[in-house]
Amino acid sequence: MPGVVMDNANIGGLRHGPGNTYPQDGLSHSRGEVAQFNGANAQDGPVHVNGVEKNASQSRSVEAIPSNHASRVTKGPPELPHITQGFFPFAKLVNRSVQQCWNDLSDLITEMAEMQVNSHGIHPSTAPTTGKSPGNQSPGNIRKKLRILEFSHAKRAEFIKLLVLSQWSRQAADVSKLIDIQNFIRTRHQAYTNALQWVGDMKRDLVQAQVANPDLKTALEVLSRGKVASMSDLGYKPPRRLTVRGTLRKLQKINRLIGARLVVQDEIPPPFKSYRVHDGRVTFAVPGEFELDLSIGEENENSQFFFVDIRFLFSPSPPILKGRLLNELEMTINDVLQNSGLTGCFDLLHNLVLTNKINILFKQATELARSSWSDGLRVELLHRTLVVQYWTLKPGTKSWLEIGIKSGHRKSDSESPGLPSLKFRWVRDGGEVPCEDIAFDAKNLSMETVLRSVIALHVSHTLSSAYCKIRQSSLFSTGFLSLRAHLTRTEPGDCQLDVQLTETRHLQVSIEPMSGVSILSAKPTVSDRFDMERNPERSSVEDIVSRVARIRCNAAIEEIESKVKMLGFEPLNPRAWKLDIRRIFPPNFLRFTLFSHQLWGRSWIVAATSSMDGDSWWVVQLRPTLPAKGPPIPHANGYGQPILRSAQVVTDSFFPARYDIDDAYLANLGHSLSGILAIQSNARYLSDLQSIKFHPPPHKLKIEPDLRVPDILVRYDVSTLPSVFRVAMPAKAKKKSLIRDTIRLAFHGVDPREKCAIMVAYGNLVDSTATLCPLISSWDRSLVFQKGGTGFAMRLLAPAGHPVIVSLLENLQRLECVLSILETLQRKKVEIRTFSLSSISFIYGSERDLAASLNIHLSRNESLMKLSPTDLASRREFLFGLRLGIQFGLQNPHRRIQESLASSLNRSPTEAGLETVVELLTLTLPLMRALDQLMANPSHSGPLRLHVTVRNAKTYQLHYPGDEARFQLVAASHQNRLVWVLKDANSQGNSKNDDSITARLRQTLYTSKGDGWKGLETGVVAEVDQVGNLLRELEKCFVASRADRADPKHKPTDYAANHTGLNNPEISALAIKKGTTDGAKLSLSDSLTTLPNDKGNLSQADTAAQKEDIIMID
């Protein structure tokens, strides 16, 4: 019956009356004695809780009685065993019921909250007779009320049951007694039944122990007479003993009977078609299974075959049964032969062999799982199906092999019935696959061989799949790297995949047969810090491919890092720079590294990227956020965060040429990387300018397979250049370009002294350079010309990464300026000695004894150089400022008017100024030589006699300080030819000249005529090459005047008294003016315009003289 529920008032109370006792071993004890024994426990509290002791086990159903009460004997009946199993407190039932009620109420409230109730219920138009409002009678509201009512009724019924149980539990003591009585009755009934069973078994066993009484009489008769007279004689005669020949005839007769029977009558199953009749028996042989010997017992053709012997043809095979088991097998086979014939016999033995083979394979698999394959196999035998799971510890999908017996049901299109056979079912990585290639020998059973064959096929499939995926990569599909797979069907340890990582490193991929873990071993060893990522959800093929890819790329990067460090390449940490390099590279690359070099500009670095599709070198352009004057790029601590501007791949492999990678090759590689970086920086600069055409574009500039750096073809046309890059060229150079419009910019190595990249610009002139080659300066190596052609080359130096486009445009325009100047000088019959881009040296004079050099200087606006190419091209200011200069030797007389001539050179246009200077050199040469003679002062201790002020190359003021006499010497045009005009420059009111000097000058010069000069009353005109004679005559006048003043008897003449007097001057040093006046014109015809009589011209010269500075030279 169900468990008894007790009220809390009886918890711990005893359910026996005052006279109850506890039986123990046939003895009974009073209740008081038990209470006295358990007195210690009774003091602490109730001994029983709902009839169960506090320290008793829950599995005990009968209360244990202390053993020390066994000696006590009572006269009453024995105490019944007390049943306490299944009792529980009534309070627990109440608590659980209350809790369940609360939970159901919460669910009811939630359910009602989800019900939608229409707030506007349907109200009748008339009020009910009771006068009460019916309320909301909508269907939703009615359903809520019904749910509340149903819940209330259900819970009320439950609590009524609890009330009934509460009342009944108060009488639980009587019910407990009834339970004990019922248990006692059942125990007695079971004991009675057991006694009857024991008596029956004993009676049955005694039958075998019965022994018949000995028949001594019969035994005596047999022993004495040798026979028993009471037994009847049937008249049988013992057969004659067979001889050897007779035995042979009998066996041959049996053989004939068996052979004829098998041929004519019996139905032989197909597996028994191969048989052999011998020795009075027939032997049926089933290859790989068994040999069965049968024979006949009668000549009757309908008699059955009988079992003789059986031999198994596979190994290992169980031993031939002996004794009782062999008898059982013989009886079974004979029964089958009698009922089903040979076909039934074959089916029996065939299934027996198949089952036996499965059991043998199961035992072998179990031994493997316990020994060498421990933790790698899981073996189960389900009926006649062997399941072997391998690689049990490998995460992901599982693989196993099932070996079972396939039923040989007849196929619909087959006439012969099928035979049961051992079949395999292979589940590889969660999917069933064909298993025809599994190596299985039915004669020699070996579970390890089968398992190794299955694992070898699995490994081969994995490695071949990985081979196909890796083969799809460009590096392996093109044959740049080798990939070979060694696969076998029998031995998994021989399956491996050989992968060439780099030129010198190889990787061997294999799979451990017992655990299924892929093993990657590289030679030489490669760092495995990038081979730590494992995804258990990824398949083995994907895992191998991804690991091979990571290791290959890591090996390639390690190799390139180790090789280029000796070239001075310094690796960079992109994390320190906070550069997101991955966003500018293709998504398929796996590893990369950045390098900088001390020879490169700080805004360029190179990157080496590696992927399964190839290894590449990239040039990366950065835009630093700090000023240009900063530390070199490897030291990133003091930098602002650089900005990635562009990246361009420049090679398709780390080593483009498949040669021996030696030190020389690495040096060439470093040379090529520096060169491509220099070329890329110039191409990027031209691309940003957008106004100068060039070819090829930056994305097509790559290092050639022979490590040759490509060139850039730049279209040079001054007319299309942005105005900021133009230079004020000579007039002829503006009209006609002297350089053809295609310039080839090439990289020619690194200058070891300057630590700069050498960029060479190749171009062609419009005219031949045959006359220019001998004139090129030997010390200037920045410009060379082609002998016998029109080609030229310019050498430009800049750190790799710094564009030379600005310098190229500057030098090309400088070259055009030089060529224009050379053409002008040659047209003026000036002999050129040497020239370069910065100076032109030439000789002049009638005897070609005077040398001079023209200097060409181009200044840059450094503030504009800091702008980006785009901003620079949009500016209207000029980046270059052209200024020409002329320089003479210390012995050249023209050194005194060097600055004046330089000022004439820089007038616009430049060519006009140059022609003017060449004419001025011819014009002023006699004058300069005459002044040198007048200034000859070997002792350098004489007083200042003559002071010459150079207003410009054609205007001079002669001042004799001692005589306060001033003269102006001007080049002018007289009768359509150039002459020198000397006239008095003293003001009429401020003249302090001695009348004798004035008279002497008038008499000697103004009204006289000499060699190459002639007086004009107010001045003197002299030929250009005879002006020295005029100056010497002038000097003689002052020398004579000084001599007269030194003689005390000297008296001024009347002629001298009527004129302004002159002091006795000393010859002064020559004063030279720097620069020119506004009145001096570039055109010679404009400068030499009037004769000395023109006072307006004199006034203009005096006005110009007041605006000029004077430089004193000894």
UniProtKB/Swiss-Prot annotation:
One of its GO terms (molecular function) is transcription coregulator activity. It is found in: Nucleus. One of its GO terms (biological process) is regulation of transcription by RNA polymerase II. GO terms for cellular component: core mediator complex; mediator complex. Its main location: nucleus. Residues 126-140 have a biased composition (Polar residues). Keywords: Activator, Nucleus, Transcription, Transcription regulation. It comes from the Eukaryota. It holds the Pfam family Med14. Residues 1-27, 40-79, 120-141 are annotated as: Disordered. InterPro entries: Med14_N (IPR055122), Mediator_Med14 (IPR013947). Component of the Mediator complex. Component of the Mediator complex, a coactivator involved in the regulated transcription of nearly all RNA polymerase II-dependent genes. Mediator functions as a bridge to convey information from gene-specific regulatory proteins to the basal RNA polymerase II transcription machinery. Mediator is recruited to promoters by direct interactions with regulatory proteins and serves as a scaffold for the assembly of a functional preinitiation complex with RNA polymerase II and the general transcription factors. Belongs to the Mediator complex subunit 14 family. PANTHER family: MEDIATOR COMPLEX SUBUNIT, MEDIATOR OF RNA POLYMERASE II TRANSCRIPTION SUBUNIT 14. This is Mediator of RNA polymerase II transcription subunit 14. The lineage of its organism: Eukaryota, Fungi, Dikarya, Ascomycota, Pezizomycotina. The gene is rgr1.
